[in-house]
């Protein structure tokens, strides 16, 4: 999300007014640019950061957070497994009904399986998107079309956010996955 209003709208649509957990995988415009606003607005109970900068360090002094290259956390009936190295940054979110694999820094992500695959900008080595029920590409508009073409040629059921709008994914306890494009 590149606008706090998009996050607020998504939270309002499910009747949520606070966050249990905020993951900040790394300091970059696409992954942490709204972190301070989100922390201030939604007061997450727990924050996990793969890395920080001076601005983030300042606010995290007063928050319940952990700076770690890996974590295995259970919150609100969901399980998050997170790992970052100099080659990759991934999270596996286990929810009732489905598992989502989120690849923040693509390089090599072997043996990672799930129902939903969320990618940033490139397809990492070691992942077969056709093995997922849904693939979402979060990339800039100029990069999205080339990567989308590759994903579609591999047989992936794929959506892109870059230049096309945000995607809402709802996972039901039955395992049914509903994907909607948000205005």
Regions found by a protein language model. Give the residues of each.
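Non-globular, low-confidence helical/coil segments that flank catalytic cores
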Residues: 1-183
């Amino acid at each position: 999300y590149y606008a706090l209003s998009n996050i607020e709208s998504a939270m309002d649509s499910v009747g949520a007014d606070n966050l249990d957990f905020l993951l900040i995988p790394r300091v970059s415009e696409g992954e942490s640019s709204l972190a301070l606003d989100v922390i201030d607005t939604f007061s997450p109970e727990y924050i996990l950061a793969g890395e920080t900068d001076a601005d983030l360090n300042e606010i995290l002094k007063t928050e319940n957070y952990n700076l770690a290259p890996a974590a295995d956390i259970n919150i609100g009936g969901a399980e998050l497994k997170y790992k970052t190295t100099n080659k990759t940054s991934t999270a596996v979110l286990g929810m009732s009904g489905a598992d989502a694999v989120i690849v923040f820094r693509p390089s090599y992500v072997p043996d990672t399986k799930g129902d939903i695959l969320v990618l940033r900008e490139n397809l990492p080595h070691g992942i077969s998107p056709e093995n997922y029920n849904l693939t979402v590409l979060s990339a800039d508009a100029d990069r999205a079309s080339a990567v989308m073409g590759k994903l579609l040629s591999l047989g992936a059921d794929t959506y892109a956010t870059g230049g096309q709008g945000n995607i809402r994914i709802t996972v039901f306890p039955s395992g049914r996955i509903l994907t909607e494009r948000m205005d």
